[in-house]
Amino acid sequence: MRFWLLLLLGSCLHAQSGENVLLVVNRNVPVSRQIADYYRPRRSVPPKNVCTIDTTGDEEIQWGVYEQQIERPIGDCLKRAGLVEKVLYIVTTMGVPLKVDGPGARDLAEHASVDSELALLYGKLKGQRYPRMGGVRNPFFMRRDSAFQHPAFPIYLVTRLAAYDLADVQAMIDRSLEARNRGKFVIDLQSEKDEPGNDWLRTAAMLLPARRVVLDETTRPLYNQTAVIGYASWGSNDDHRTQRLLHFQWLPGAIAAEFVSTSARTFRRPPDSWAPNTDWADKSRYFAGTPQGLVADLIHEGVTGASGNTYEPYLEACVRPDYLLPAYHQGRNLAESYYLSLPSLSWQSVILGDPLCALKP
């Protein structure tokens, strides 16, 4: 029985195309239109699958703006084009607002990433209602043997084409088209942390081919690795990390995940002199509100897909590398690999990359 299930799953993994993508463009931001114009022909996204919205170019917005200028128009696009079921992936572009501000903390928080909130749109179009406070359990989380399809999983998988600038986004798209299943998976623990994150990293290493894994359990962060196709670590939360950039040689299709709370808080480029750090007391070392690293640095350096967070998600809601890396290695596309590893929606996650990117043999 399991053999036939896996055979069916395998056929579904490679069946998705640009017809399953809704591309969201902000009419008021030129770079948003430029990214859409670059991406659409390369993935054969039909014209009816392009949804143009009229909203601010600010990264942070309030709930009224989100509901009236983002969620409602995107829902209208899906219904008008008859795409509610057909579309599985929503792709936002740089210039579409990034995060929604709100009060509270931990389980009472009412702030979220725009993309994570949009993941619930399918359910909302079917009449489902969700609380604004806190996260919502992701029904696709840990479903290793399940094909992602509607209505079995009543969500959209939302990814974002964003980076420091247009050139970085275009390069990321180009790399997604050249992804191949080769290279190393680099997994870097912080040995002094006795936390579940280290267990997830070790498990990820065990679930990947041993000959392709570089697992480091020392206190020394890994830099200057070559031929990297997958990476997971504590990022700038590693107390021993001193360099802003990893200086890896990333292969086309490479993905990354770091346990960093606010790495997708902005896509503004910091000064070259700035470096992430763990000193929360010294606000002179902050950039865009915190001292933590930025996921856009990974894209700039050559990563094809990466996860980050807009506000504090807490470790238990971060992307799980023990699900992400094996799923991607086994042939899942980028969007499904990340959402398979993501515990909560309507929360803080931002998934960067082309959802259709998958490792070819």
Model-identified regions with their sequence ranges:
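Sec-dependent N-terminal signal peptides
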Residues: 3-12
